[in-house]
Amino acid sequence: MNWKGHTILGIIFGLPFISSPEQIFLALAGALYPDLDHDVKEDIVKRGLLISGGIVFINILLYFFDKHLFNVDLFILGVLILLIYLIPYFSDHRGLTHTFWSLLFVSSILGYLAYKLSFISSVFAGLISLLMVTNEVLLGRVMIFAVFAWAVLDILNPNINVNGALYYILPVVFGYLSHLVGDTMTPAGVRAFYPLSNYKLRKKEGYILVAIWALMAVYVWKYMILSLL
């Protein structure tokens, strides 16, 4: 499945569980992240490694030369971002980035990063997450779909009560899940439990995941509607 398919599927999977524009960006970031193990390694991944590695290195220097300037939060942030890019850098295509382990790990980091940046602006935080997994060409294309999803949200005007870091993590989870589901529908399948198992999820398992997602979506919207009555 190409970027367009993953973008559309990411929006579909994310919409039932989000209620704001920044969450659209986060869902799209999750939907596009797994394919950082592919052709964009030379572009997006290496750029991310240089930036995050620079943040970590500068903080280490500050720690040894002037501890008063050392920023623990910035250091941790740099390490987390570095980990996000190291996974696809050392992964084969449809390797570690296409697993449930990576889904949980990366979603937590991207969501937490957005949560920490939300003091500036929640929309800015979501957009930064999307920028981390795209280049200027892909970002321009994806934003067209993001604006459409934004319009749909404006019409539906949902009120899903999720707060704190979870508010930023969940959209990434559902976006990421959409990517794995999309790839189960292809002949190559997905080794979602790699490296513990090489068993491939294919269409049958993909349909099961879609059914689970649909049940969760129905439950969330049923709860939301009942809370309004």
Swiss-Prot record:
UniProt key word Membrane: yes
Is Cell membrane among the key words of this record? Answer: yes
**InterPro entries according to UniProt:** YdjM-like
Which residue spans traverse the membrane?
8-28, 49-69, 70-90, 113-133, 136-156, 162-182, 208-228
Membrane topology type:
Multi-pass membrane protein
Main location, first listed in the record:
membrane
Q: Do you know which Pfam families this protein is assigned to?
A: YdjM (PF04307)
| Locations listed in the record | Cell membrane
A cellular component term, taken from the record's GO annotations: plasma membrane
Q: Which domain of life is it from?
A: Archaea
Keywords recorded for this protein, A-Z: Cell membrane, Membrane, Transmembrane, Transmembrane helix
Q: What is this protein called?
A: Uncharacterized protein MJ0790
Q: Which organism is this protein's natural source? A: Methanocaldococcus jannaschii (strain ATCC 43067 / DSM 2661 / JAL-1 / JCM 10045 / NBRC 100440) (Methanococcus jannaschii)
